[in-house]
């Protein structure tokens, strides 16, 4: 049986082919991007946990996560309650996201915004810029080394930051070859969706000190954050635990303060 990641990649190729027909690259690239915000500096400033708060309606492994899903309202709440950056799921088929959600969230916040999607074609990088992304996600498991370098350099030429995500030591080594300081360690396997937050602690030893480690998936409690901070990890991408909360603002504050 194909892994979830393989199914997503196959569908994404079809999706991008349709997008290119509907709006060819020469048309897309003429659209004027808006203001680009500094994602990297936002994660560096001060000593409190640097939370990238995620706007996510559903996932392939968990199904519907938040029924009452108002992108504009969630973006405002995250902004008012101490998030450093936002992450917005734009995948339609598997995560019930939408590219329009990114543009909407960006219009409701002063924070930098990450486009969380499965990038397999340079077209999506130009699209991300037009939608208002300040940072894109590149997933090592999805791309070869040439694609990773080309996509990373293209995004940076367009003035966006790049978060490169790995799940294994081998993937991490490939990620570290790229000219970006943002190193994501996904504690959840994109092949079987099993989660283990110890993975970030295990892989941290291989990451140079000039990089910013972002631990992703499975960070659900204040104790999880304190554990990571005790091992020198201070940036967190958090979605599901916030999206499941009745009071999103309080849930975010609770993660960040004793």
Curated annotation (Swiss-Prot):
The reaction(s) this protein catalyses: 1-(2-carboxyphenylamino)-1-deoxy-D-ribulose 5-phosphate + H(+) = (1S,2R)-1-C-(indol-3-yl)glycerol 3-phosphate + CO2 + H2O
GO MF entries: indole-3-glycerol-phosphate synthase activity; phosphoribosylanthranilate isomerase activity
Keyword Cell membrane: no
Listed pathway(s): Amino-acid biosynthesis; L-tryptophan biosynthesis; L-tryptophan from chorismate: step 4/5
Matching Pfam families: IGPS
Superkingdom of the organism of origin: Bacteria
GO annotation terms (biological process): L-tryptophan biosynthetic process
Keywords for this protein: Amino-acid biosynthesis, Aromatic amino acid biosynthesis, Decarboxylase, Lyase, Tryptophan biosynthesis
Enzyme Commission designation: 4.1.1.48
HAMAP family recorded: IGPS_B
Family named by the database record: Belongs to the TrpC family.
The protein's name in its UniProt record: Indole-3-glycerol phosphate synthase
Lineage: Bacteria, Pseudomonadati, Pseudomonadota, Gammaproteobacteria, Legionellales
